[in-house]
Regions:
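Metal-dependent amide/peptide-bond hydrolase catalytic core
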Residues: 1-4, 28, 54, 183, ...
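Short helix-capping segments at alpha-helix termini
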Residues: 49, 133-137, 164-165, 285-292
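A structural signal for isolated positions on well-ordered beta-strands in alpha/beta enzyme cores
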Residues: 54, 79, 142-144, 296
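Acidic/His- and Gly-rich active-site-bordering loop/insert found
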Residues: 2-111, 132-137
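Intrinsic-disorder/low-complexity, polar/charged segments enriched in Ser/Thr/Lys/Arg/Asp/Glu/Gln
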Residues: 64, 140, 257-261
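Fold-level recognition of mixed alpha/beta catalytic cores in primary-metabolism enzymes, strongest
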Residues: 105-108, 113-114, 118-224, 233
Length: 327
């Protein structure tokens, strides 16, 4: 068996740096994403390594890709996954051009260099190193570079549903983790609640039904709801937070409409459908106490919590590798 240092050579480390710099220079701030040029650049580099590359178009300006080094088929594939988009650079001034990809002080500076074009570049270089070493693979090595992770997971949803993806034994996602292995992730359940009332002049509020006050009642009820869960040893507990509130048109007009968004973070073992039912039951109870109470709830985002057992062979192997290579 070849040692890691015989496979991943200094030129591959240099390639990873170059790939990261070039990807940072391609603007993929999401929204709107516009990941197509980054996907095309990634595809061109992986094709040079001998990978079979398939572009996965979403819109005229957005795409993901699948690259594959073929194995013998004796084992399921190992899937590398990384996203092409990045969050906006914000309003604060940068010390370096956020789209410059400048190498300074031992770091690559730019939007997405950590989250997660650096991880994507490392996977590209690793794939190149394995291809050049001509190591027989028991299963395929697949790299999925996806669009839209920062918003709606457009690319990941599309790629995971493709029939040609094939069986996968493990997924590696090199989000910035300071070389720690993360084996669990909280789920996300975003809800939008809307209350509807009856407008009236502010001088005669008794003639209307105040939708904002209805929302206040619901938020108070939400704080008292107990959502069944077990504390997770790695992730902690379930959380809920009302993070936006919008309603009313003028100070002297009783509002007839109000919306709020709720960010819930779930832990393994929780059922999102059961949580939604509990919220809907809370609405029913409020309506029973106040016949004029009108509310509806809508799911904005639904991602279930995930975890891999610590004793899983892939986790154990990754832990061994990290121990060997991290100073």
């Amino acid at each position: 068996m070849m040692e890691l240092k015989e496979i991943f050579r200094p030129r591959h480390e240099e390639a990873a740096v170059k790939y990261c710099q070039e990807l940072v220079r391609i603007k993929t701030v999401n929204p709107p994403g516009d990941e197509l040029p980054a996907a095309e650049y990634t595809a061109s580099q992986l094709e040079r390594s001998g990978a079979d590359v398939e572009m996965v178009p979403h819109t005229a300006a957005r795409a993901s890709l699948l690259a594959r080094l073929r194995g013998s088929g004796r084992a399921p594939a190992l899937l590398y996954n990384g996203h092409l988009d990045s969050v906006p650079p914000g309003d604060e001034p940068w010390s370096h051009d956020p789209l410059g990809g400048e190498l300074a002080d031992g770091r690559i500076w730019g939007r997405g260099s950590a989250d997660m074009k650096g991880g994507l570049a490392a996977m590209m270089a690793a794939m190149q190193a394995l291809a050049e070493a001509n190591i027989p693979l028991a299963g395929d090595l697949i790299l999925a570079a996806t669009a839209g992770e920062e918003t709606d997971s457009l690319g990941a949803i599309s790629i995971s549903s493709r029939p040609n993806l094939g069986p996968v034994q493990a997924v590696v996602i090199p989000e910035p983790s300071s070389n720690e292995i993360f084996i669990a992730e909280k789920g996300v359940l975003w809800l939008e609640l809307a209350t509807r009332g009856k407008t009236a002049h502010g001088s005669m509020p008794e003639l209307g039904h105040n939708a904002i006050m209805m929302m206040v009642d619901f938020i108070s009820a939400l704080r008292e709801m107990e959502f069944s869960h077990k504390e997770h040893p790695l992730l902690g507990g379930f959380s809920r937070s009302v993070n936006t509130l919008s309603g009313g048109v003028k100070t002297n007009v009783v509002p007839d409409f109000c919306t709020a968004t709720i960010d819930m973070r779930t832990v393994p073992g929780q059922d999102h459908a059961a949580i939604l039912r509990q919220v809907e039951e809370g609405i029913t109870r409020l309506k029973g106490r106040r016949p004029e109470f009108q509310a509806s709830v809508r799911v904005l985002k639904d991602r279930v919590p995930v975890e891999t057992p610590p004793e899983d062979p892939a986790v154990q192997r990754f832990a061994q590798i990290v121990t060997e290579i991290v100073p």
